[in-house]
Amino acid sequence: MHAYLHCLSHSPLVGYVDPAQEVLDEVNGVIASARERIAAFSPELVVLFAPDHYNGFFYDVMPPFCLGVGATAIGDFGSAAGELPVPVELAEACAHAVMKSGIDLAVSYCMQVDHGFAQPLEFLLGGLDKVPVLPVFINGVATPLPGFQRTRMLGEAIGRFTSTLNKRVLFLGAGGLSHQPPVPELAKADAHMRDRLLGSGKDLPATERELRQQRVISAAEKFVEDQRTLHPLNPIWDNQFMTLLEQGRIQELDAVSNEELSAIAGKSTHEIKTWVAAFAAISAFGNWRSEGRYYRPIPEWIAGFGSLSARTEN
């Protein structure tokens, strides 16, 4: 069967701190075109690789990878809330297959996800519940982080499993590209924030969640005025990364350490490993070609914003 892929940056700042209307129209047009291509493909199953931002995963237990056998989106920053339509038996079979391939994949029957999962489903499929989905969390902010090599191997294992299903499979990678918004770090946290990072942040009071969101919005507004206030975006790195993906050279990223990536492009750039997993997965279906490449640095969203599709040729 055929597979399709789309990787897309996300930002909680969409609708809160937006770029000029012409830029917004351009991005919306790119997303609309991707949505049309996906609709024409008519996926029967979605595999969504996405990160978390201390909304569902915490330091009480922080896996490098986790497959949601059941998952619920919390609706942060105005994103869609509700249950994701996970096919339980298929998710369980996927977990077993990945484990047998040598990848230690955690599973959760009550995975809590945020805008990192919700936005791509909203933007590209029109909602959380449109197509059965296997949601795969990849840790992109909480050290110690998985590296490129292990993430690639995860994608390959999931790709091999889904290639046996006789279904039209859509792989989505969500996050990146270069960026470093104000995300708390355990090593620098005060007592209150440390408690939140250790797990109490899973059920934040509404007032505290609003304050947290406002801090991100304020940081974006300052970044627009002075891009020295946060780690700068890195369009050169972002475009080099997208070229590696397009050329099927993702294995070259194995040599890039987590420390090097953080220094080059920002500490939240590790979200791009969702793109690596997606491209590794589609490779299990045979030859593919990329299409629909788009990139623009958008300071208002504190992100090097990218969009890239691929389709199998067999």
UniProtKB/Swiss-Prot annotation:
Q: Which reaction does it catalyse?
A: 3-(2,3-dihydroxyphenyl)propanoate + O2 = (2Z,4E)-2-hydroxy-6-oxonona-2,4-dienedioate + H(+); (2E)-3-(2,3-dihydroxyphenyl)prop-2-enoate + O2 = (2Z,4E,7E)-2-hydroxy-6-oxonona-2,4,7-trienedioate + H(+)
Cofactor requirements of the protein: Fe(2+)
Pfam families in UniProt: LigB (PF02900)
Q: Which residues does the entry assign to the active site, renumbered to this chain? A: 115 (proton donor), 179 (proton acceptor)
Q: Kindly state the subunit structure of this protein.
A: Homotetramer.
Q: Quick one: a GO biological-process term for this protein?
A: 3-phenylpropionate catabolic process
Where does the source fall among the domains of life? Bacteria
What job does the chain carry out? Catalyzes the non-heme iron(II)-dependent oxidative cleavage of 2,3-dihydroxyphenylpropionic acid and 2,3-dihydroxicinnamic acid into 2-hydroxy-6-ketononadienedioate and 2-hydroxy-6-ketononatrienedioate, respectively.
Say which species the protein is native to: Escherichia coli O81 (strain ED1a)
Give the family per the record: Belongs to the LigB/MhpB extradiol dioxygenase family.
Instruction: Supply the EC number(s).
Output: 1.13.11.16
Database matches in InterPro entries: DHPP/DHXA_dioxygenase, Xdiol_dOase_suB
Which pathway does the UniProt entry assign to this protein?
Answer: Aromatic compound metabolism; 3-phenylpropanoate degradation
Keywords carried by this UniProt record: Aromatic hydrocarbons catabolism, Dioxygenase, Iron, Oxidoreductase
- Which GO terms of the molecular function aspect are on file? 3-carboxyethylcatechol 2,3-dioxygenase activity; ferrous iron binding
> How is this protein named in the record?
2,3-dihydroxyphenylpropionate/2,3-dihydroxicinnamic acid 1,2-dioxygenase
